Amino acid sequence: MNLERDNELRFESTSAPDGLYVVAKASNYMPHPEFPLPSIDLEGSSREEAYEIKCDGFSDSFTYGDIVAVSNNRKKVSGILSKNAKQNTLLVTERCDNLCSFCSQPPNNNPDTHLYVDAAYAIVNFNTDSMVGITGGEPLLNKRKFSTFMEILNKGGNTTPLHILTNGRAFSDSNFCSQVVELSSKRYILWGIPLHGHNQELHDKCVSMPGAFVETMQGLMNLSYTGQNIELRTVVTKDNYKNLKNISELVNSSFPFIFTHAIMNLEPKGWAKRNFDSLYVSVKEQMPHISECVFNNTLKGLESMLFNYPLCETPKNIQKYYCKSISDWKNYYPAFCNGCADKNDCGGFFSSSVGDYLNNIKLEVKV
């Protein structure tokens, strides 16, 4: 499978211990004064905190200024933040207080609190004006560690805009909500918060957690009233696809300060792959309900965005809401996309989109 960009390479050897590094020539590398990371490059150096790596394809996949992670046990170097990436996203935890049946990154209880600090150091040293995504798990589940993450960014003089994916439940605590808003004052943040149902029964079923709907709704209210930027997100499944318009009605009647609704196709990975047969509804069946939701959003002044769909199955009258949303390190174009005139405008498919999912799409587009 040919991915758009290789984000993980196997190396021959390296002098670097496990950890994060800035790809840079040792001779002209200036580490951050408060939160420095060592440098790594194909060329050797006698300079302390400058390391060498022997790795085919390293220069093709990574460029100066990128942040990479070295794992000697796996003999792998992985891109953490890349200047060549269409989107950069950092995982800060694998723990979550929801158990979504369609989760592509199933939660676990492995020790991972170091990821918050690693992410903060990576962002400070990468120092980009482009938006960086923060995801989990649930990034706000460990409130203390999330606050530390934000404090490091602020102390490091960093103002990188962030797109933080959270289930929003932590914001039901109004004191914590106020604390986060204060910590966020030096940067633009877009909070991506999911609402998968128009009532408690449906949303709680989708996330497999009784009481989640009430906390998410309260969190949305608390956060929206502070003037923070919120992108509402709905993953479409067999359980909720016929209620997309109802979700739109709830958002428009309850949250006048939310202006964006992202409607998302499944990523067939993790629990979504395990539960595929009970979750997946064909794109062809989804689209009439998506169109209805989009038109209702438009009437109410709510912007719609369509994520993770093939362009060829998106009706012409709603293609202006289409987004090339799949990260370049996990997207590809199957053979039946070859020769398609719209390929450059299409986001393609997740690399996990194989088997029944892909066969279904092939039948629908009649390739």
Predicted feature residues:
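Short Lys/Arg-enriched alpha/beta "domain-start" segment
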Residues: 1-36
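N-terminal [4Fe-4S]-dependent radical SAM core
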Residues: 34-36, 40-89, 320-324
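Short, electropositive alpha-helical surface patch
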Residues: 151-154, 242-259, 315-331
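Conserved C-terminal portion of the radical SAM core fold
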Residues: 132, 188-191, 214-277, 282-309
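Canonical Radical SAM [4Fe-4S] cluster-binding loop centered on the CxxxCxxC motif
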Residues: 80-117, 343
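Flexible mid-to-C-terminal extensions adjoining Fe-S/redox cofactors in radical SAM and related proteins
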Residues: 3-7, 315-367
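Distinct, well-ordered alpha-helical segments
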Residues: 144-151, 172-182, 242-251
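Core AdoMet radical
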Residues: 103-115, 126-142, 156-173, 183-217, ...
